[in-house]
């Protein structure tokens, strides 16, 4: 402010700076100013009572001061004197003037009536505010929220549609008085994310709306609720399955003849599928635990009765198939031997993901290296097909977490890359010269970070990358941590040249089961179809075909 202009504060409280001389004004961003608030009256006792006294005394000599009436109404409202607040707001409306302040009077009258459990008058006042200033939608939001909570979903939705007509009508947010930005940013859409279930909005529409919410960096309660509601809107990929040239029934028989003490000692779980040297390699994880109806991990005795779990065991069975006249012919099956030096309560390599590169079969998996006080490493290595065993090392990264899982591989220009994290997309490289076939710890180095949408802070890796044309495709997963976990999935497509994220799909399930998981898929170029292997409830491995064009129709962006 220029010292040559006679500025002064005006008002008995909620003062503002003005001058009797001519002056110009402009907006400054919050980053350009700093307020040193000395002796802030708002932090002292009896603020509302003091403000009420000051404003009432001032109105005795200036009864038509619109600013005093407005802030007196606010003070009565904040002091829970709702009838007096309503009276002040109505007087302020009668004076006319600044439309922003008048709208707030209507909105606050509605809020006061709501506090007094008079919802009919509250709704009337909020509607009057909308009539006065239709781009201010906070009152309409309150109506939507009220009707949704009362189970009047169709009414709530019609008010939502009204709001959508004006949602983007605010010319400049900085010119709005006390704008409640969260209403416009996510609260309106959050309401319809709940309403959609009750009024049967198409799942694909609701799926996209939920993704938009998750991309807005919303509060945790909105994020958690949206994830929970996705169980109703997630697309069912099984409905998109098609018939392929190769019958897949043989894949469900993998490992049926493994040795075990009784029928329930081990059972098949999640498969990993991979094309390698024109053959199909499938590794099926066999485990000794089951998930009971309460979501707890148990073993089963010889009679199939649940028992407490004394140890978590994994056995990986690899089957090799070649193609003959559109048939899958099994040519070999074996249990993969591994370096067992870290076997403890947890035994075996969990979640092996196969990856073909330069005529060798690579893999990643999870190895628990310490228990109790759980510590896991990503085990990375090669599958020695002649000796039917792994040769591998444990991967380390700077600032490694005690529990590391779900790192996935892809290749480009004769190099292997590792995706460590999906938010930001963090791509690493491993110096292959350090690979010495011993289960020792080796470092990976971050190669590149790529900015991605906010939803990817929830994403974890599922499959290794599959090259399709000039792109690299993945399946990833998201977990909604509720009383019982719910798993969701997405396809993600990276540009092969710069690894930027080109697009990703709407959220789907494999067959609408609560716990689902995949470790791999393959792309059949001759059919333009993917073969996907997955498990449900850590059991029941299954496989199906999906056309690439049907997956493309599911893409979110």
Language model features with spans:
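Catalytic-site signature of metal-activated, phosphate-bearing donor transferases
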Residues: 1-87, 236
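Start-of-helix register in tetratricopeptide repeats
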Residues: 67, 101-104, 137-138, 155, ...
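Beta-propeller domains
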Residues: 239-557
């Amino acid at each position: 402010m220029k010292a040559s202009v006679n500025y002064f504060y005006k008002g008995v409280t909620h003062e503002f700076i003005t001058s009797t001389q001519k002056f110009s004004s402009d907006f400054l961003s919050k980053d350009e100013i700093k307020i040193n608030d000395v002796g802030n009256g708002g932090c002292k006792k009896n603020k509302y009572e003091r403000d009420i006294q000051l404003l009432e005394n001032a109105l005795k000599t200036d009864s038509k001061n619109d600013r005093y009436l407005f802030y007196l109404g606010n003070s009565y409202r904040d002091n829970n004197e709702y009838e007096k607040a309503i009276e002040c707001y109505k007087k302020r409306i009668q004076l006319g003037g600044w439309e922003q302040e008048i709208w707030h009077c209507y909105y606050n009258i509605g809020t006061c009536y709501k506090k007094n459990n008079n919802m009919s008058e509250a709704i009337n006042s909020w509607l009057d505010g909308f009539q006065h200033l239709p781009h201010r939608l906070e009152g309409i939001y309150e109506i939507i929220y009220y009707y949704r909570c009362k189970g009047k979903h169709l009414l709530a939705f019609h008010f939502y549609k009204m709001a959508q007509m004006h949602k983007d009508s605010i010319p400049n947010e900085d010119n709005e008085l006390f704008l409640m930005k969260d209403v416009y940013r996510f609260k309106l859409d959050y309401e319809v994310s709940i309403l959609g279930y009750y009024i049967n909005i198409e799942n694909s529409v609701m799926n996209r709306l939920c993704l938009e919410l998750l991309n807005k960096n919303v509060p945790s309660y909105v994020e958690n609720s949206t994830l929970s509601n996705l169980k109703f809107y997630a697309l069912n990929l099984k409905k998109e399955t098609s018939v392929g040239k190769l019958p897949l029934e043989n894949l469900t028989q993998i490992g049926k003849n493994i040795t075990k003490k009784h029928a329930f000692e081990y059972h098949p779980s999640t498969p990993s599928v991979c094309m390698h040297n024109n053959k199909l390699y499938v590794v099926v994880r066999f485990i000794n635990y089951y998930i009971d109806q309460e979501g707890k991990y148990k073993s089963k005795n010889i009679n199939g009765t649940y028992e407490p779990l004394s140890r978590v065991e994994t056995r990986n069975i690899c089957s090799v198939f070649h193609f003959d006249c559109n048939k899958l012919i099994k040519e070999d099956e074996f249990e993969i031997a591994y370096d067992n030096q870290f076997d403890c309560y947890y035994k075996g390599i969990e979640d092996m993901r196969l990856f073909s590169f330069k005529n060798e079969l690579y893999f990643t998996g999870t190895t628990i290296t310490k228990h109790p006080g759980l510590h896991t490493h990503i085990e990375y290595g090669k599958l020695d097909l002649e000796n039917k065993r792994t040769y591998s090392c444990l991967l380390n990264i700077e600032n490694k977490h005690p529990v590391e899982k779900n790192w996935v591989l892809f290749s480009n220009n004769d190099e292997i890359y590792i995706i460590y994290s999906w938010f930001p997309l963090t791509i690493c490289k491993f110096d292959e010269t350090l690979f010495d076939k011993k289960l020792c710890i080796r470092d990976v180095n971050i190669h590149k970070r790529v900015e991605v949408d906010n939803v990817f802070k929830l994403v974890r890796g599922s499959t290794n990358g599959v090259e399709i044309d000039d792109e690299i495709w993945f399946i990833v997963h998201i977990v909604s941590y509720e009383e019982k976990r719910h798993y969701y999935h997405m396809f993600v497509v990276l540009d092969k040249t710069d690894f930027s994220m080109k697009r990703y799909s709407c959220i789907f399930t494999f067959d609408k089961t609560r716990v689902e998981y995949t470790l791999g898929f393959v792309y059949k170029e001759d059919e333009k179809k993917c073969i996907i292997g997955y498990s449900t409830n850590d059991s029941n491995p299954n496989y199906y075909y999906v056309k690439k064009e049907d997956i493309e129709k599911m893409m979110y962006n």
